[in-house]
Amino acid sequence: MSKEKFERTKPHCNIGTIGHVDHGKTTLTAAITKVLSETGGAVFTDYDQIDKAPEEKKRGITISTSHVEYETTKRHYAHIDCPGHEDYVKNMITGAAQMDGAILVVSAVDGPMPQTREHILLSRQVGVPSLVVFLNKVDMVNDPEMLDLVEMEVRELLLSYKYPGDEIPIIRGSALKALQGEIEYKKSILKLMEAVDNYIPQPERSFDRPFLMPVEDVFSIAGRGTVVTGRVEQGQIKIGDAVEIIGLGSTVKTTCTGIEMFHKLLDYGQAGDNLGMLIRGIQRDAVQRGQVICAPGSVKPHTKYEAQVYILTKEEGGRHKPFFNNYRPQFFFRTADVTGTIQLPKDVEMVNPGDNVKLIIELITPIAMEEGIRFAMREGGRTIGAGVVSKIIE
């Protein structure tokens, strides 16, 4: 069967749902597709389809990242449903990096919970520029004052992570009731989408910069070759363009021989697109998650850099104790996850939770990086720091 061509008419935006486990992120994602499907803006995707990776079923919690697409009158959206449970924050770090904006889902029954805080922090550290809040399960709260209190708490939390908590739209509703077709709650979904349309700015796409796409996954397709998937971070790619694959080892040169998005063929891909790229003459095992595909000569792999880093407090889910020179956590750059050694400044004996400090970091394998890129520091399955590269050393 031949694939249909992907039409670019409306501006495109990548968003996602974030928030605490069981606050209703996946139900809301399903409800958005249901309500928008009634005006032809989406194909209804039910909860089980969004929550679909095999290991997810066993634990009843969302683990991997699901992509759905829909459109409003203003924009076309690719929506990511992010994992909620802290065991799977690793996935969120790479997932949240794919967002131009996010819908923070907070249960009106519980109010903000530990992962609500962690996801706001992660959004801040991976550079999600703006958030809209959906106060879910309001049908289960009888006292309007209670809703006002929860809303106030959410606004204060957003402000504490340097988001404009006073102006962020907070929409009250019930994703489940909307999914069940109750008119009042379907209206709250439309109101939410209106807030997303108007409040989350149309991202400035860096079309003019050299092409770069972090590698998320690699597949081998019989008779066609190797396909690499990811979200284009900057620039454009056309069929026939030369590219380089960089990081985690030697640099490989190849050519882009095909591009597809949402199972439709494209002539070109551009910043913001989640796409699959067919590459010529490269074996499946020569490319791995964590590398980047880029315009030849545009990016260099590095191992040593200076960074400004914020170390999370115990209350934020970070370390309980200080760390010292030569501490070795994991560093997350885009989709890469690499061990590195930390060198403290000469006048600093140790770094305590809550400190903001300049560090020199040396990774065990080179990663494509440039000044201004953000990264996360993790240890034993939890985020312990957020940083930005201030200077490349080697």
From Swiss-Prot:
Looking at the record, which segments are called G3?
81-84
The job of this chain, per UniProt, is described as: This protein promotes the GTP-dependent binding of aminoacyl-tRNA to the A-site of ribosomes during protein biosynthesis.
- Write down the Pfam families for this protein, in alphabetical order: GTP_EFTU, GTP_EFTU_D2, GTP_EFTU_D3
> What's the protein called, per UniProt?
Elongation factor Tu, mitochondrial
The record's section on SUPFAM superfamilies has:
EF-Tu/eEF-1alpha/eIF2-gamma C-terminal domain, P-loop containing nucleoside triphosphate hydrolases, Translation proteins
CDD domains, alphabetically?
Answer: EF_Tu, EFTU_II, EFTU_III
Q: Where is this region: G4?
A: 136-139
Task: Supply the gene name.
Answer: TUFA
* Annotated tr-type G domain residues: 10-204
